């Protein structure tokens, strides 16, 4: 369990770096929605290759029955996220700061959602960390 805990976060970090690097590197002449289409097509193909590697013998029909509304709603969130970053980078946001601004703002919005919807608890240390993150965001925004 401990391996999965750290591996999952490491994978998230590595994939996030690759994600932002590739978003910034997409040709400025490429149509954003066509680019997203082929991004999802490559992601779908990678997923189809990985399913039998990670879950040999998986019955797709049974697995599909376990899905709920959140899987499909996530599709809308992913399109918005990816289109938003693609357009932000085209509008001139720096790779080094664009994701930081976004992630701090997302964290501020997710805190009350985590507490109210998922009954997560926040300690004083968490609130201090949030204050420091917001302070850093303000300092980064100063010219």
Locations of regions flagged by a protein language model:
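C-terminal transmembrane-helix exit sites in multi-pass transporters
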Residues: 106-125
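Membrane-interface interhelical linkers
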Residues: 1-16, 28-33, 38-72, 76, ...
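Small-residue-mediated transmembrane helix hinge/kink sites in multi-pass secondary transporters
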Residues: 24, 86, 114-115
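Residue-level hotspots within transmembrane alpha-helices of multi-pass secondary transporters
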Residues: 21, 83, 108-112
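Non-cytosolic membrane-interface motifs at loop->transmembrane helix junctions
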Residues: 67, 97-100
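Residue-level recognition of transmembrane alpha-helices
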Residues: 39-40, 99-103, 126, 130
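Hydrophobic transmembrane alpha-helices of multi-pass small-molecule transport proteins
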Residues: 125-141
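Transmembrane-helix signature of multi-pass solute transporters
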Residues: 45-49, 109-113, 135-139
């Amino acid at each position: 369990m401990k391996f999965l805990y750290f591996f999952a976060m490491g994978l998230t970090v590595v994939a996030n770096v690759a994600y932002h690097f590739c978003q910034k590197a997409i040709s400025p002449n490429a149509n954003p929605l066509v680019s997203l289409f082929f991004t999802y097509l490559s992601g779908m193909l990678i997923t189809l290759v990985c399913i039998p590697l990670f879950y040999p013998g998986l019955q797709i029909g049974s697995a599909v029955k376990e899905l709920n509304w959140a899987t499909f709603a996530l599709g809308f969130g992913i399109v918005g996220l990816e289109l938003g970053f693609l357009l932000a980078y085209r509008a001139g946001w720096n790779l080094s700061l664009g994701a930081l601004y976004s992630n701090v703002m997302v964290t501020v919005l997710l805190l009350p959602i985590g507490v109210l919807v998922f009954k997560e608890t926040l300690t004083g240390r968490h609130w201090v960390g949030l204050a420091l993150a917001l302070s850093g965001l303000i300092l980064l925004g100063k010219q």
